[in-house]
Amino acid sequence: MPKADIHPTWYPDAKVTCNGEVIMTVGSTKPEINVEIWSGNHPFYTGTQKIIDTEGRVDRFMRKYGMKEKTTGDKQDKKKK
C-alpha cells in the first residue's frame, strides 16, 4: 500500500500553452505548462528555416593568412628588374 500524502497531485488534463494559445493537453504534476517554442512555430519544422551559406574552413584559413595559389610569377619578375 503506497503512503498517503507524499505523492504530488496528478493533473491528467494539464494544458500546454504557447503565447496564450492552448496547444495540447498532457498529464502532468502542474495544471498548466507554458512553453516558448514548440513544433508548430519552430523554423525547422515549419519549413521557414534560413540556410546560411558559410565558406569552408580551409578557404577561410587561406583567405585570412594570405596563402593563395601561386600566380604566374608577376611579383618575381618585378623584383628582378
Swiss-Prot record:
From which residue to which does the signal peptide run? none
Q: List the disulfide bonds.
A: none
Biological processes annotated in GO: translation
Q: Which GO terms describe its cellular component?
A: ribonucleoprotein complex; ribosome
Does the keyword Nucleotide-binding feature in the UniProt annotation? no
Q: InterPro entries from the xrefs?
A: Ribosomal_bL28/bL31-like_sf, Ribosomal_bL31, Ribosomal_bL31_A, Ribosomal_bL31_sf
Pfam families named in the record: Ribosomal_L31
Family in the record:
Belongs to the bacterial ribosomal protein bL31 family. Type A subfamily.
Q: What does this protein do?
A: Binds the 23S rRNA.
Protein name, per record: Large ribosomal subunit protein bL31
Gene for this chain: rpmE
